[in-house]
């Protein structure tokens, strides 16, 4: 179970400029700054950005990229997603997965009957939620920890959670 290797994965979003020398504030979608630094080069709407420096900030991280040298350039990046290709993410143990790998997988009930396809993974604070779209295009959500059994090529949804 792996998403397309060239699919872009958003690791952070630029939330604004920091100072006058081109640094940007980031909202990270990963907790590990060391791993974020290891990627080195990110895509910002198709433009490569080379990470020079990263430090913590009360609202996320502050980063400096080689290509961004002043506040105007930094401000222009506000709202820009910083992405890497899926193939750049490290391999995981057999019993772990990235949420991106769940999206697009067929969902079935315990008997193997098709329910729909997974379309999103969300977290509203109480745990991870899988959103499933049925054939009639109606959607419903299930808690991943209690209701989803992950297989390489499909997801089995516990009967009690199927709408």
Curated annotation (Swiss-Prot):
GO cellular component terms listed in the entry, alphabetical order: cytoplasm; ribosome
GO molecular function: ribosome binding
Keyword Iron-sulfur assigned: no
Localization per record: Cytoplasm
Main location: cytoplasm
Domain of life from the UniProt record: Bacteria
Signal peptide: none
Entry keyword annotation includes Chaperone: yes
Subunit structure: Binds ribosomal protein uS19.
Function: An accessory protein needed during the final step in the assembly of 30S ribosomal subunit, possibly for assembly of the head region. Essential for efficient processing of 16S rRNA. May be needed both before and after RbfA during the maturation of 16S rRNA. It has affinity for free ribosomal 30S subunits but not for 70S ribosomes.
Protein's name in the database: Ribosome maturation factor RimM
């Amino acid at each position: 179970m792996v998403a397309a290797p060239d699919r872009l994965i958003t690791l952070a979003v630029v939330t604004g400029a920091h100072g006058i020398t081109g640094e940007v504030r980031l909202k990270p979608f990963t907790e590990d700054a060391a791993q974020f630094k290891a990627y080195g080069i990110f895509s910002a709407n198709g433009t490569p950005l080379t990470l020079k420096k990263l430090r913590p900030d009360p609202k996320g991280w502050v980063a400096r990229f080689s290509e961004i040298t002043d506040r105007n350039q930094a401000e222009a990046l506000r709202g820009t997603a910083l992405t890497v290709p899926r193939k750049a993410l490290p391999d995981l143990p057999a019993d772990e997965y990235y949420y991106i790998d769940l999206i697009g997988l067929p969902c079935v009930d315990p008997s193997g009957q098709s329910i729909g396809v997974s379309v999103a993974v969300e977290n509203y604070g109480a745990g991870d939620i899988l959103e499933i779209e049925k054939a009639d295009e109606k959607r419903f959500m299930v808690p991943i920890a209690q209701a989803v059994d992950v297989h390489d090529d499909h997801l089995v949804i516990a009967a009690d959670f199927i709408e």
